[in-house]
Amino acid sequence: MLVATDADWIYDEVDAALGGADTSVLRVRRGVDVVPACKQVEPALVVIDLQIGNMGGMAAATAVRQEQEAGRLADSGVIMLLDRHPDVFLAQTCGADGWLIKPLDAFRVRQAAEAVLGGGTWFEGLPGEGEDVEDPVADVTDDPEATADDPAGGGDDSVVAADAR
C-alpha cells in the first residue's frame, strides 16, 4: 500500500490500521511523487491526503487515474482523505474509489480499505440512500413560500420539499 501525505500523524494512523506482517505501507510526502511510486511498487491501494504539499491530493489522484486509463500504470484502488464534508464535491471529480473525512480512526480506515480492495467503494459524507451521488447538493430556494409544486412561491401553505433526485 502507498500513502501520500506530508503529515506524520496521518501516515501513522493509516500504517497502524493497515500495516502488518504481510502488508507493507510505503509513504511519499509529495503529490508529484505518487505516480512514480505507483510505477515502482504497484500498490494494491493508494491512500492520498487532500492536503499533501507540492501537488494537491486531487491532482495526484487524477494523475493516477489518467495513467491507469492510458495503460501506463497498473490498476489500484484509490482512497482520498478529506478535511471536511464540502470536499466531497472535489473528491467526486478525481475518480477515487472511496474517501474518508478526517479525523481518521483505525476502524473506518480498515473498513474503507477492505471495501475498495474487495472491488467496492467507500464514500463518507454523501446524501442519504436513494439520492443522486453525482449531485449531493439539493436544489434550494431563498423563498420560504416556495414548494416543490410552486418553486416561485405563491403563498401555498404546503411544506417545502427538497429535490432528492
Model-derived features: positions:
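Conserved acidic segment of CheY-like receiver
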Residues: 1-18, 46
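Acidic, metal-coordinating helix/loop segments flanking the phosphotransfer/catalytic sites
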Residues: 29-45
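His-Asp phosphorelay/catalytic-motif detector in bacterial-type signaling
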Residues: 42-44, 69-77
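Conserved phosphotransfer microenvironments
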Residues: 44-66
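Two-component signal transduction core modules
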Residues: 46, 99-100
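Alpha4 helix (beta4-alpha4-beta5 surface) of REC/receiver domains from two-component response regulators
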Residues: 59, 80-98
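C-terminal output helix
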Residues: 104-113
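The C-terminal output helix
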Residues: 114-129
